Amino acid sequence: MTKTYLPPQDALEREWYIVDATDQRLGRLASEIAMVLRGKKKAEYTPHLDTGDFVIVINAEKIAVTGKKRTQKLYRRHSGRPGGMKTETFAKLQQRIPERIVEHAVKGMLPKNSLGKQLFTKLKVYAGPTHPHAAQKPKELKVNTIPGAES
């Protein structure tokens, strides 16, 4: 009988990665970030444990989408009150809270349970080029989300 490998939690080494979202495609970038957060590219990956790394996303205000999504993609939220549904386009949300766009895309690609919530806390998104995590010495994560472009 094959058993799932259980890595010791204290032996796991968590890396810090930094991603520049300037002109990157939203969905492709989010799927790469979700893979790193889950730890799927590590040898010690275990489906029910948090084996992933930390990811810092900078320049979230400069993320790109293709086609007419800038004006047609809608983000919805509800206040919990009757008639409390609020709808906002991608362009308006990008002006108001650009971090939420990346967070929303990545959160949708993580498990919908307590493990997903734990993984989501390891994502740090910032609208501008600065971040307060210099002490962690993050490595640059090369992500090519533009089809046909050289990385």
UniProtKB/Swiss-Prot annotation:
It holds the Pfam family Ribosomal_L13. PANTHER family: LARGE RIBOSOMAL SUBUNIT PROTEIN UL13M, RIBOSOMAL PROTEIN L13. Keywords: Ribonucleoprotein, Ribosomal protein. One of its GO terms (cellular component) is cytosolic large ribosomal subunit. The gene is rplM. One of its GO terms (biological process) is negative regulation of translation. Transmembrane segments: none annotated. This is Large ribosomal subunit protein uL13.
